[in-house]
Swiss-Prot record:
Name recorded for this polypeptide: Cyclin-D-binding Myb-like transcription factor 1
Keyword terms: Activator, Cell cycle, DNA-binding, Nucleus, Repeat, Transcription, Transcription regulation, Tumor suppressor
GO molecular function per UniProt: DNA-binding transcription factor activity, RNA polymerase II-specific; RNA polymerase II cis-regulatory region sequence-specific DNA binding
Organism: Danio rerio
PANTHER family: CYCLIN-D-BINDING MYB-LIKE TRANSCRIPTION FACTOR 1
Biased composition (Polar residues): 615-625
Lineage of origin: Eukaryota, Metazoa, Chordata, Craniata, Vertebrata
Ranges of Acidic residues composition bias in the record: 36-46, 95-105
Annotated localization: Nucleus
Family of the protein in this entry: Belongs to the DMTF1 family.
Amino acid sequence: MNTGDVPATVTLESVNSVTFTQDTDGNIILHCPQNDGEDLGSDETTEPVHKRIRLSSEDGEDPQDSASTEYSVVTLPITDGDESFEVTMTATEMRDEELESDDLSETTGKDSSAQKKGEDVSAVSQAWFTTKEDKDTLVNKGHKWKQGMWSKEEIDLLMTNIELYLKNRGIQDPAEIIFEMSKEERKDFYRSIACGLNRPLFAVYRRVLRMYDNRNHVGKYTDEEINKLKELRQKHGNDWATIGSALGRSASSVKDRCRLMKDTCNTGKWTEEEERRLAEVVHELTGTEAGDVVTQGVSWASVAELVGTRSEKQCRSKWLNYLNWKQSGGTEWTKEDDINLVRRIAELEVEDENEINWDILASGWSSVRSPQWLRSKWWTIKRQVANHKELPFPVLLKGLQDVVEAPPSTMNKVVVVGSRSANASPSPVTALQIPVQIPVQITHVSSSDGSSGTSDSETITLNSGALQTFELLPSFHLQPTGTPGTYFLQTGTNQSLPLTLSANPTVTLTAAASPSSPDQIILHSLTTDTENVTVQMSHPGIIIQTVTSEDLADPLGQSELEGEQVLVKEEPSENQTNPAIEEPSEEQSKQGEKTLDSSKVVETVLMVPSPGSFIPTNEDISSDSVLPLGTLTDPILENQEEGSN
């Protein structure tokens, strides 16, 4: 693959295969062969070029006898020698949508056995203790509970508990209980939904308020609101509920905003005098000496008051993220530190990142500026996995270990995280759901080379001989994920691999168990005069929907790829006619131009855009003017539009 100066233009010269296989666990594995000229259909190429890691709840457990869910992490490095394609693929755990209430009870710990775990759980999650004395009493009795950020598992459990509570009482909206009912009417609500959560009732109460109070998600404060907030603060003091009601915001929101608001705050770069003053105040209030590491036990409100020119948030951030590290002689953070951080967290063998003691982890690490800074560094690393919020923590760690250990020359990595439920029957919806993001790339070879491709039903070879065909059946549709440009490739009737290879030199994408259907889209591309096919693109790709004019009245969702019309294939025979295409003249045939008879067939190709994608304009195909629509320049579509004009 030769890449020009413009990164969006890629010229592919060689022929390579992309092989999808499916193991016994239902995991999709993508094989990336090297450009070494080996026969892609030979047995030697079946040796996997990836490494797989299986994770299960109990090692050695028979998967057929287990009701647990198993996860696999598959990583595929793209090396310098493998220039055939670029692929980014991720997969998340998918569960059956229809679960019986008994199954929900088992998974959420609502059954009687879960409630009998011990008095330590009930003592914490069933008590309204808010004072230090109450907490000390429970600690002295040996009780422990979780603090800090809520994990995905905790939030899922809380939401399930709320849904069950509402279902049992015939209530539709939880806001009726939280904001409208009296304390007497909702007295058992918080104790019921806190079951299985090792957190105090007050923590559950605060979490629920933040989740369901719409006033907590209003947005950034305007200058007018700031001025009004100052007036209300002078009038009502610390009556946050009254202030929040007057502003249309939650009490916690106005409290946090007032805490960070200060009229005398400077902005921008800190001066040397401000840094010196901050260091003096911190060491004075904590009783430490210059050069000592101070990360805990600091009243930042008091620090800000004595510094005078910065808010407590500014003081805290400046000290923990820079000044403390600078004065103690710290070193710079490197790529090796990224690897060590993931390794050290994995060695802790914790089930959730909230169990990590960042003070201990940061201790003695010269390049760590503070425990808080180290935690933010971890957040930056884990965001490299787009669906990190949906993955169990051990699975996320396994994937991240391969990502951070990649050398600079192999920055492009393919991370596949698959899962299956051992006893779950295949669901028509969740049989195979994989979020996939694959840039379109085309190779161009002679027909003889293309006919020599392997007949393996799980291998796809993009060969362009005299004609190249892509067939997309209506049984496929794309379900958007939370990540822009990434979608679920979803099949409806089978769990087998949804891609097969046709026997001819053309390429067909079809569902293995789906019958042939006349409602399909066939996109044809002619051979070019040159030996190379140039594809202009950027990441991520696009979805092309083809519909007839009578269907344009119905809105088309971005989440579904449907074929409503067949684009007619051009044949070299002069005697063959087609009602959808006017017979071209001899001169037009030499130029490869075609004219559509708009009175017979009216079709529209809808380009569903995604961030960063584009397609060259037909008016000036050689210029830099582009439309933010697609990624693929198709000769047929260009000639059709030129003929129509």
